[in-house]
Regions:
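Short, ordered, surface-exposed loop/turn motifs in non-cytosolic proteins
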Residues: 229-256
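Non-catalytic cell-wall polysaccharide-engagement segments
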Residues: 2-53, 58-62, 66, 106-219
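Short, functionally critical alpha-helical segments immediately adjacent to catalytic or ligand/cofactor-binding
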Residues: 69-87, 140, 167-173
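Short, acidic Ser/Thr/Gly-rich low-complexity loop/linker segments typical of extracellular
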Residues: 247-276
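A short, amphipathic beta-strand motif
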Residues: 219-229
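Conserved alpha-helical segments that form or flank metal/cofactor-binding pockets of metalloenzymes
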Residues: 83-98, 102, 106, 111-112
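A short, solvent-exposed loop/turn motif at the edges and junctions
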Residues: 291-294
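Short Pro-Gly-centered beta-turn/loop motif in secreted/extracellular proteins
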Residues: 231, 278-289
Length: 294
């Protein structure tokens, strides 16, 4: 079936011409050279492989932490692919849309309240914070959760193809507008801009089920211990614990739902000469708890 990174690997888009760029656009802001996670330019998909993979991994981790199902996790990743091509410094020329989820200036300014409502804590996305990769990953997650909640509120169900299409349509056309009755009326009519429909067909409909299947695969994971100088720590005793029979619909967590009975795999060992543990096989996003012993 291939590889998650291979499926999500973005293609570099095209730069805006001078005539296309409006005053509200952030496309001409210089990218700080000292940023750890940054794009090569403001163009969609113009990001190096290391940054791309870190952003994919961060979004997966956040989706797991907030208990999303694998199909929802796949959808959240595809939002980032469609909007910015995983370039945290991407910016539109024809609007003020910027960052990983392409929030406009107004929706970025409103993000502090929205993150508090949905995630339980405030995140400031205003100004150039919209280009911060970690903040942007939260922005992608909230984009999915906010519009998912609207779709459910308006009577759409996950077993309906329109439910999945609606989530991206709402984000693409600006989620703030759709909280009122005008948005609900338009959602029920299900008439959207052609570019939004084309993107949904090309990115989401084509890849959602395949990416979901890839995320459900078991992968090999190793613990690697190093000191502050990056040197391997050998012969360190450890315990690694995972859930024995993970949920097939979503990542499994040992630290959540503690009243539920769970079978646990426990591995005892010592790190090898490379500072590595024995391999552990688990589904992507599953929680792995590690204890280091004297």
């Amino acid at each position: 079936m291939g590889d998650i990174y291979q499926l999500l690997k973005p293609k570099k888009g095209y730069a805006y011409t001078k005539e296309q760029i409006i005053d509200a656009s952030l496309v001409n802001l210089p990218i700080p050279t000292g940023k750890k996670l940054k794009g090569n330019s403001r163009v969609i998909g113009d990001v190096d492989e290391e940054t791309f993979k870190i952003i994919v991994d961060t979004i997966i981790s956040l989706c797991s932490r907030f208990n999303l199902e694998y199909q929802e996790m796949a959808y959240t990743l595809l939002i980032c692919l469609a909007e910015s091509g995983f370039n945290p410094d991407a910016a539109a020329g024809t609007t003020s849309a910027s960052g990983l989820a392409q929030y406009t200036r107004s929706t970025a300014d409103a993000f502090k309240a929205r993150s508090k409502s949905i995630l339980g804590f405030e995140i400031d996305m205003s100004g150039t914070n919209v280009f911060d990769a970690n903040i942007g990953c939260y922005g992608v997650l909230v984009a999915f959760l906010f519009n998912k909640n609207l779709a459910l509120k308006w009577g759409f169900k996950p077993n309906d193809d329109k439910y999945w299409q609606l989530i991206y349509m709402l984000h693409h056309d600006g989620p703030g507008y759709y909280e009122d009755d005008r948005g609900k009326e338009r959602a029920l009519r299900f008439k959207w801009r052609k570019d939004a429909i084309d993107t949904y067909e090309r990115v989401f409909k084509k890849n959602l089920l395949l990416l979901t299947a890839l995320l459900k695969q078991k992968v090999e994971t190793k613990l690697k211990l190093t000191d502050h100088e990056g040197k391997a720590i050998e012969n360190k005793n450890y315990i690694i614990a995972t859930v024995k029979s993970p949920d097939r619909k979503k990542p499994t967590h040992l630290s959540m739902n503690r009243n539920e009975k769970k079978e646990i795999n426990v591995v005892f060992g010592k790190t090898n000469s490379n500072g590595e543990s024995s391999p552990v096989h688990s589904r992507i996003g599953d929680e792995i708890i590690t204890l280091l012993l004297p």
